[in-house]
Amino acid sequence: MPSLIVVGGQWGDEGKGSIIAYLALHDEPEIIARGGVGTNAGHSVFINGKKYAVRQLPTGFMQRKARLLVGAGVLVDPEVFFHELEHLKEFNVKDRVGIDYRCAIIEEKHKELDRTNGYLHGKIGTTGSGCGPANADRVMRKAKQAKDIKELEPYLTDVAAEINDALDEGALVLVEGTQGFGLSLYYGTYPYVTSKDVTASSVAADVGIGPTRVDDVIVVFKSFPTRVGAGPFPTEMPMEEADRLGLVEYGTVTGRRRRVGWFDFEMARYSARVNGATMLAITMLDKYDKEAFGVTDYDKLPRKAKEFIEEIEERVGVPVGLIKTGPELEHIIDLRENI
C-alpha cells in the first residue's frame, strides 16, 4: 500500500483538515502522521455538526483504527499536546498517539519572545505560538527534545522506524502537512513566511519518509485563497468585496480575520510543480458557486462550478481528485478513480 502526503498550495487555511479527515475515514490508513512546523497552524474539521480544531495532533484523529504520529521535524508544545489529548478523549487518542523522541520542544520563553518581538509579531505577523524562536534554538542546537520532557515519556517513539516498518508491511500511511506553499521559508513570500519549508518533500522528511517511498502528493487549493498576517497577496480583493461575497473567515490559531483574494492560477501551477503534485483537491467550491453546495456527484455540479474545475486542471496541469462542496465530511466529490 502507498504513502500519501497532503499539503497546502496557497497561504494555509486551504481546508486541508477537511480533506485529511475524509481520507482518514474513507481510505482507512493504518498510520496518520503529522509533519510541518508545529502548533502555529490549526486544522479544523466538522463531525456531525461539531467543530474540532487541532494544532498539534494529526487531523485524522477521528479514524479510531489508526496510529497517530508526530514526526521528528515537528515542534511540540507539551501544553497544547496534553490539552488536545483531553479535548479529543472521546476518540481515544491517548492510547494511539506517538511523538518522535527527537521532536524539539516549544517552551514558554519561545512563546513570550514570539509575542513580544516587534519584528516577528509586529512586521511579520506571527501567530505568537513560539515556533520561530523554537526553531531558531533548534538550529543553534540549544532546543530541548521530547526525550528530555518526563511527562512525554509514555508517548515517545521512533516515528521514522514505525512508518517505514508499516510501509514494508504494505500498510497505508497518510501524512499531513501544515500551512501552505506561499508560507514556505524557501519558496514563499520571504520574509513574510513561516520558520521552515513546508513543501511535500520537507513534510516527507519530517516524518522520516524518503523520496522514493512517496506514492501520491495531494496539493489543496481553496476556491478563494486567504492569508493571515502581513505579506504580499497579488490577487487580494478589497475587504468590502469579500464582505459582499460572504467570504468572512477567521484564523484557527490567531482568531484574526483572513485576507481574501481571487484564485491565482499562476501561483497554483508553480506550487503544484514544486510540490510534485499527483492530484489536486479543491475546497469551498460552494463559495465560488453557491449552487454547488452539498453536491456529491460531479455530473450534477452546476455549469459555473464545472468550468472552474476544468480551468484549474487545464491551467495548473494536474488533475483534480477531490472537491469539497460544503463544511461537513460528506460534502465531497471523489474523482480519484478517474485519474
From Swiss-Prot:
The keyword Cell division does not apply. Keywords: Cytoplasm, GTP-binding, Ligase, Magnesium, Metal-binding, Nucleotide-binding, Purine biosynthesis. GTP binds at residues 12-18, 42-44, 258, 284-286, 324-326. GO terms for biological process: 'de novo' AMP biosynthetic process; IMP metabolic process. Substrate binds at residues 252-258. Binds 1 Mg(2+) ion per subunit. Its cofactor is Mg(2+). It is an enzyme of class 6 (ligase). The keyword S-adenosyl-L-methionine does not apply. It comes from the Archaea. IMP binds at residues 13-16, 40-43, 127, 141, 179, 194, 256. The active site is at residues 13, 43. Pfam families: Adenylsucc_synt (PF00709). It is found in: Cytoplasm. InterPro entries: Adenylosuccin_syn_GTP-bd, Adenylosuccinate_synth_dom1, Adenylosuccinate_synth_dom2, Adenylosuccinate_synth_dom3, Adenylosuccinate_synthetase, P-loop_NTPase. It catalyses: IMP + L-aspartate + GTP = N(6)-(1,2-dicarboxyethyl)-AMP + GDP + phosphate + 2 H(+). Its EC number is 6.3.4.4. GO terms for cellular component: cytoplasm. Mg(2+) binds at residues 13, 42. One of its GO terms (molecular function) is adenylosuccinate synthase activity. Belongs to the adenylosuccinate synthetase family. Homodimer. Plays an important role in the de novo pathway of purine nucleotide biosynthesis. Catalyzes the first committed step in the biosynthesis of AMP from IMP. HAMAP family: Adenylosucc_synth. This is Adenylosuccinate synthetase. It comes from Pyrococcus abyssi (strain GE5 / Orsay). The lineage of its organism: Archaea, Methanobacteriati, Methanobacteriota, Thermococci, Thermococcales. The gene is purA.
